[in-house]
Amino acid sequence: VELSIDIRSTLAQSKARVARMVKEQARVIARRRGLGIEVLKIREENPVPLDPGLLRLTKNICKSAGIDYEIMPSGAGHDAMQMAKITPAAMIFVPSRRGISHNPLEWTDPDDIALGAQLLMETLIRVGNEKF
């Protein structure tokens, strides 16, 4: 049996703690069942903080445009992790029906896509004009 786990968090120490707990429990279960176990770390990436100025800017644009928003941490390995190493980075999420994303069942209402695009456009204009 092969199992892979993607442990996500905005805190590196939380990811490490969960990884240790999973390994310990897997070894306990394997021992109890008389099985062998091999644990391999395929990849480990440290969380990258997003730019507070860009986050503040997008929040302020939402407020002034009457766009409902929610500040959400993301523990996923998005392109923003790589970009944040060389430039200020932030992410804009739009809601998907029933919270399903990265899946064939994902559906986002076109009006929400339009609002997300409007927010992105206004953010880019202000950043381009250095108004943040």
Tell me what each language-model feature is.
Residues 1-17, 27, 42-43:
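Midchain, well-structured core segments that form catalytic/ion-binding scaffolds
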Residues 13-14, 19-25, 94-132:
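His/Asp/Glu-rich mid-to-C-terminal helical/loop segments that flank catalytic regions of hydrolases
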Residues 36, 40, 44-95:
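Active-site-adjacent substrate-binding region
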